[in-house]
A protein has these predicted regions:
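Short beta-strand segments that buttress and anchor functional surface loops
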Residues: 18-22
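A generic structural-conservation signal
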Residues: 1-2, 85
């Protein structure tokens, strides 16, 4: 299923059983049979999460997919999930040229 971002996890009787997602204007409720795997990328494009977990890297120009905003991490934490090794961020160091802000 493409272009269908999850918006929140579905909690039932002490466990995550699915996700609420959106495809265009349609809201979908997708129930999992055996579990939910959150494979949502990193969070280097979330200023909030970068400041929280790795303040030294928060001011570095991020590299990678601009969709890496930590949405999956935030959804899991909303239900009490713990996180590990968030200070280890894979990064390609670079810089912006003054006349070329997208460089």
């Amino acid at each position: 299923m493409f272009n269908t971002p999850a918006e929140r996890l579905i909690w039932d009787e002490g466990r995550i059983v699915g996700v609420r997602a959106r495809k265009g204007s349609e809201v979908l409720y997708i129930r999992a049979l055996k579990g939910v795997i959150i494979a949502s990328g990193g969070f280097q494009y979330s200023k909030e999460l970068m400041e929280k977990y790795n303040p030294l890297m928060a001011k570095v120009t991020p590299a990678g997919c601009k969709g890496n905003t930590g949405d999956g991490l935030k959804m899991a934490q909303a239900y009490g999930a713990d996180v590990l090794d968030t200070n280890y961020i894979k990064a390609t160091f670079g810089y912006q040229l003054g006349n070329y802000p997208d460089s």
